[in-house]
């Protein structure tokens, strides 16, 4: 278990299990922390929606055979694309997910955005067609603006 201590608080009061992958980070709170809000300092991939920029960001995600291959017309490897979407969406407060039952909190900006974009393609078409999906990110929320099949 990794220990994360908030400024001025004893480490024993701030124990969380932290798991990090390319897709994001998850924090599991112990029983004595269940229901407590996590300190803002614990988040490294996402900005609080109240501190996110006032201007929305727009991502145009291009897919080939159902796989994301470019952002705003710039071709990228899958790893580069995930990292780019994580940075952009996270800066706009998108990607915090909380499971109140288990006490797990996740930061997964790219997963949230790419899931929404993939869903917009439609289940039957996503593996067969090339497409572009436009997503708007704004103060902790996201929405698919348009989806076009090639």
Predicted regions and their residues:
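Nucleotide-activated chemistry modules centered on ATP-dependent adenylation/adenylyltransferase
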Residues: 1-150
């Amino acid at each position: 278990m990794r220990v994360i201590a908030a400024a001025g608080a004893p480490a024993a009061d701030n124990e969380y299990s932290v798991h990090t992958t390319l897709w994001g980070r998850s924090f599991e709170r112990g029983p004595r922390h269940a229901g407590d809000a996590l300190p803002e300092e614990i988040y490294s991939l996402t900005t609080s929606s109240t501190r996110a920029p006032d201007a929305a960001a727009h991502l145009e995600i291009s897919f080939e055979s159902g796989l994301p291959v470019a952002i705003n017309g710039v071709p990228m490897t899958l790893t580069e694309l995930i990292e780019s979407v994580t940075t952009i969406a996270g800066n706009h407060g998108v990607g915090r997910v909380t499971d109140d039952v288990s006490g797990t909190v996740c930061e997964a900006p790219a997963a949230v955005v790419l899931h929404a974009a993939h869903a917009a393609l439609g289940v039957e078409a996503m593996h067969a067609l090339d497409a572009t999906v436009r997503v708007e990110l704004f103060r902790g929320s996201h929405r698919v603006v348009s989806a076009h099949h090639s």
